[in-house]
From Swiss-Prot:
It comes from the Eukaryota. It comes from Paulinella chromatophora. The gene is cpcT. The keyword tRNA processing does not apply. InterPro entries: CpcT/CpeT, CpcT/CpeT_sf. This is Chromophore lyase CpcT/CpeT.
Amino acid sequence: MSASLSQLVHQLSARFNNQQQAFDNPPLYAHIVVNCRPLVHLLPGSLLIEQSYAMDPLKPYRIRVLRAQTRDEKLIIFSYSLSDEQKYWGSVYEPERMLKIEEKDLQAIEGCNYIVRKKNSNFIGEVEPGCRCLVDRKGVTTYIVSKFELTNKGEMRTLDRGHNPVTHEQLWGSLGGVFEFNRTTDFSKEIPYDWIEEWKK
């Protein structure tokens, strides 16, 4: 399990974009950049993730801290919001700013953790069941159904959709289907040696 955890964090630690997909299908897919970079000074498995439109990469529409860990022989990615998150916008491009993020800045997001399973050399994650991962979108409360798949070839596929908590009707999300990202920058060399040693225990 520790080897899988290490592999998961290594594959997550990257910059991804869906440039080709967006160019091929502009009505259906925005051009999005996803940065996921190790927070080397925090607990093992901690990553800062920013998702932004390529035209405005320093103003992410979503910024979170993820923490990949094992619990009860399961791979789980815990999700945290940041207090005063705007203060850290674009910090994935300036690692020295990432170092200013402290544990006290993190707030656990109830119901939004990912349960991850390994399939061959790929990882498949889904938000925990229960419809409890709530997000306000344009003033309307929705719950997220979110899935991702990471491959050992540097590919990432994601699907996020928001639903009405009462009727379960889909209110937002991809109409064209899965977003297909490719790794453009590898940040895995930034993973601290002590994390790797901790995972071996």
